[in-house]
Regions:
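A conserved beta-strand/loop capping segment in the N-terminal third of enzymes
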Residues: 55-107
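Conserved dinucleotide-binding and phosphotransfer motif residues
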Residues: 23, 114-118
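Conserved N-terminal glycine-rich FAD pyrophosphate-binding loop of Rossmann-like flavoproteins
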Residues: 34-54
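Conserved small/polar residues in nucleotide/adenosyl-binding loops
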Residues: 133-139
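A conserved beta-strand/loop element that lines the FAD pocket in flavoprotein oxidoreductases
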Residues: 117-127
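N-terminal Rossmann-like FAD-binding beta1-loop-alpha1 element of flavoenzymes
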Residues: 4-28
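Glycine-rich FAD pyrophosphate-binding loop
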Residues: 21-41
Length: 143
């Protein structure tokens, strides 16, 4: 019996499994693909993604993956004026976390492996339907 069944082992599903584990929930993570698998994507990881990786204590492993750092964003106009935002300048009081460009095949596999370490996973498993036989919702006392 599982507390949570997560359908889809990509970044959202694997991250959900990691958060469920932090809350003490027993989860099952299923995906129709077998990892590693490729996905068409721009491969950029935003500052929000990096924040979540830090929160889950996965940033050190993430930094070891084959990819590139994003340390600056440049905005340009048709008149050739430009504006740079430096993301890694911790001296700046408005410091913004740097980002990364990591191929989805690598990033998704990394997260799926981390989820596999803490929960049961099933690959090559297609969910055709969901049947609710017993559903319990936790309640909080208002007092």
């Amino acid at each position: 019996m599982y507390d949570v069944i997560i359908v889809g082992g990509g970044p959202a599903g694997a991250t959900a499994a990691l958060y469920a584990h932090r809350e003490g929930l027993k989860s099952l993570l299923v995906d129709k693909a077998i990892f590693p698998r490729d996905k068409i994507c721009g491969d950029a990881l935003s500052g929000k993604t990096v924040r979540i990786m830090r929160e889950l204590e996965l940033i050190d492993g993430l930094e070891q993956l084959d990819g590139s750092d994003i340390n600056r964003i440049t905005f340009g106009s048709p008149s050739h004026s430009q504006f740079d935002i430096h993301l890694k300048d911790s001296q700046n009081p408005r410091h913004i976390t740097k980002g990364y460009v990591i191929p989805r095949q690598i990033f998704d596999h990394y997260l799926f492996q981390k989820a596999h370490q803490i929960c049961e996973t099933r690959e090559g498993f297609t969910v055709k339907a969901v049947s609710y036989t017993h559903l319990t919702l936790p309640t909080k006392s208002s007092g």
